[in-house]
């Protein structure tokens, strides 16, 4: 017969305290630093679809091509878009082609080779402004419509899609 080791009361108490601390850290992390919004609309297809649930990390530190959640004064709602222009960049859209600082930008993540060329844009971004576009360029209200987005309106960066819409449907 084996002798079963029993935990000392002090060790059991320390394990309970450690479990409580870890639970608190996770709660605070998920409550204040990570959100799980649901995509509304088709503007980010094919990357994300209407109904997809995203994990978003609260941060203002975003980089080129990051997908972010931002507040839109014009639409009076949060939007999910891709960062196309950074502070100090010159963005031009002409003839359905995108140029950043005079260089044509080719984007493998969009389906449309030619997108709505009726919208012409030329903007110099200020030190606290970003240019955001939806991946579904022909069906997106974005910086082409409402202009540059101030840094203060960016809520956070999309980490991943945690649940695709097709996984949410039950038959």
Where are these regions (language model features)?
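Structured, soluble extracytoplasmic/luminal domains of envelope-associated proteins
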Residues: 83-124, 129
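Short Gly/aromatic-enriched secondary-structure transition segments
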Residues: 98, 148-149
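Protein maturation boundaries and topogenic segments
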Residues: 1-78, 90, 149-171
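Active-site loop architecture of trypsin-fold serine endopeptidases
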Residues: 138-145
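Active-site/binding-pocket entry motifs
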Residues: 61, 99, 104-106, 138, ...
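Phosphate/adenylate-binding glycine loop and adjacent helical scaffold
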Residues: 134
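Conserved, short, structured surface segments that act as functional micro-motifs
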Residues: 131, 147-148
């Amino acid at each position: 017969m084996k002798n079963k080791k029993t935990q000392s009361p002090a060790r059991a108490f320390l394990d309970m305290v450690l479990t409580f601390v870890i639970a608190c850290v996770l709660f605070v992390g998920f409550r204040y630093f990570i959100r799980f919004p649901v995509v509304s609309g088709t503007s980010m297809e094919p990357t994300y679809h209407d109904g997809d649930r995203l994990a978003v990390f609260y941060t203002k530190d975003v980089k080129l091509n990051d997908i972010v959640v931002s507040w839109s004064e014009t639409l009076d709602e949060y939007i999910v878009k891709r960062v196309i222009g950074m502070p100090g960049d010159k963005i031009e859209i002409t003839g359905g082609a995108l140029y950043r600082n005079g260089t044509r930008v080719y984007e493998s993540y969009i389906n449309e080779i030619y997108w709505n060329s009726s919208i012409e844009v030329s903007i110099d971004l200020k030190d606290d402004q970003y240019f955001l576009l939806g991946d579904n360029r022909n069906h997106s209200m974005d910086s082409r419509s409402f202009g540059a987005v101030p840094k203060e309106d960016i809520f956070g960066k999309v980490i991943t899609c945690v649940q695709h819409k097709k996984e949410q449907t039950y038959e």
